[in-house]
Amino acid sequence: MCEFCIQHGEGKKWYLEMRNYSRELWAQEGRPEFMDDYGARFEERYTKRVALLDMLVNKPVVGGFIRRMAIRSQKAEHWGQMVPIEDLEQIVDLQTWIVRFPCVCRNLTTGHREARYCFGIGVDMTDTMAKYPDAGSFEVLEREEAKKVLRSFDKQGLVHSVWTFKTPYIGAICNCDQDCLAYRIQVKTNLTQVMFRAEYVGLVDWDLCNGCRKCLLHCQFGAIHYSNTMKRVTIETARCYGCGVCRAVCDKEAISLKPRADFARLPW
């Protein structure tokens, strides 16, 4: 079980605890004001932060310290954890308010303002989010509508994650590819850790795998490898984020998710 489940979930999956989406929690510690500032200054905040990290993290003396401090700051304010589709559907079932809106990361990294891959959840934040750019394209969804969209994202290979706004309040679901800022900061450049791996890790059943390699093309983390000798794929557990989207393209159902905690010394 991850540290967040211990701290915010009483030893259970923290993102399935209703109180982490509650109005009572939302009203504490200046979260409404934090969200106002987050939306209004997203581009400014992240452009400056990434530039500063890029400058400092690779310095031999202070780099490690800066990276640790950045991770500590993210854990307190705004971080994400990967969630497979079956857990994501349970999260959706907890919600009374779900809104689909354009991805601020893709807007910043690709210039596409209409890429509606993100979901606001938790307390109804209509008034707060009305201040965001492109608020006119926001779409309120019923639970089953949201699940249908999320399943389609799963088949497209988009990895799902939940995000905090002043931890442990969870206010968003993201569905990411390599245009995501978190991916670029963490996976591509290894500047700092802003998203944590799922509660699971993927495993391949070689009795079922036919070596088609569809899953290999679906993995965004380079965790799946093909053996030309064995004509099968394997998942490198140390690199696996446990997102589970590789399963969506496996016609043989050869890939399953197992609890990460069952494997010694795997990274979170």
Describe these PLM feature segments.
Residues 161-168, 172, 189-218, 222-242, ...:
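Ferredoxin-like iron-sulfur electron-transfer modules
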Residues 123-129, 181-195, 249-259:
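Short, Lys/Arg-enriched charge-dense amphipathic segments
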Residues 132-137, 145-157, 161, 175-183, ...:
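Conserved adenosyl
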Residues 1-156, 225, 234, 253-268:
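Iron-sulfur (Fe-S) cluster-binding modules
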Residues 3-4, 101-112, 170-183, 207-221, ...:
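Local cysteine-cluster metal-coordination motifs and their immediate loop/turn environment
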